Amino acid sequence: MSNSWFQFKQFTVQQDKTAMKVCTDSCVFGATVPVTTSTYTILDIGTGTGLLALMLAQRSNADIDAVELNKDAAQQATDNFFNSPWNERLHVHTCSIQDYFKFTTKQYDLIVCNPPFFSASLKTGNTSKDMALHQSHLLIDELIQVVSFMLKQSGDAYLLISIYEEVNFFQAANRVGLNVKRFQEMYDNETKLIRYVLHLRKDTEHMDHETQNFIIRSADKQYTAQFVEVLRAFYLNL
């Protein structure tokens, strides 16, 4: 059973009210998404506990909007934000991203999302977990359309996706004229590929030319030097 909280160096993530708990791949994502001094506004789509927003708040001075459909998860994220050092820059919106898009004209320097995945797999029977894991409430095309409209002309979007869904995301991006590239291949160990991170932009000027490989654990099941370097600012015992 997962703990009801996860303690980081600068903040705590309470997670007893949310279906999806803090996991290693999300932590890697939050620690490796590029942010710069020009990243003033960030949108976190499907924030859950607020983990990604909190990690990006620690890494930047940006103002961050976090959208979450599930009311319990949104309340948990609100509490986690309030108890963090960056509560004045973190804002939860309890609605679907489709509804949020309808009621705002705001565009963002950076958009991040760990979207629903395993669309072809069987559902668990747990409604909250199914909503978090499956694409019932957020289709790939809808997500990409929202990203296209809400991303600044010079902005960047990064999506943490299942390795089985990459073709669908590429096709959806092409349909709305977004440039898309595989930014990162994430491995649990040297041979076990677990996730892709996609990079989307409206232009190709600042697209990364080489895909990064990120390996979490070595053959002896210890964290790699790469992992320790990136997560040291967050994990207590690194």
From Swiss-Prot:
Name under which the protein is recorded: tRNA1(Val) (adenine(37)-N6)-methyltransferase
Keyword Transferase: yes
GO molecular function: nucleic acid binding; tRNA (adenine-N6)-methyltransferase activity
Sequence similarity: Belongs to the methyltransferase superfamily. tRNA (adenine-N(6)-)-methyltransferase family.
Top-level taxon of origin: Bacteria
A GO cellular-component term linked to this record: cytoplasm
Principal place of residence: cytoplasm
UniProt cross-references to PROSITE patterns, sorted A to Z: N6_MTASE
Biological process terms in GO annotation: methylation; tRNA processing
Biological role: Specifically methylates the adenine in position 37 of tRNA(1)(Val) (anticodon cmo5UAC).
Regions crossing the membrane: none
Catalytic activity: adenosine(37) in tRNA1(Val) + S-adenosyl-L-methionine = N(6)-methyladenosine(37) in tRNA1(Val) + S-adenosyl-L-homocysteine + H(+)
Record keywords, A-Z: Cytoplasm, Methyltransferase, S-adenosyl-L-methionine, Transferase, tRNA processing
EC assignment: 2.1.1.223
Localization: Cytoplasm
InterPro entries: DNA_methylase_N6_adenine_CS, SAM-dependent_MTases_sf, Small_mtfrase_dom, tRNA_Adenine-N(6)_MTase, tRNA_adenine-N6_MeTrfase
Keyword Transferase annotated: yes
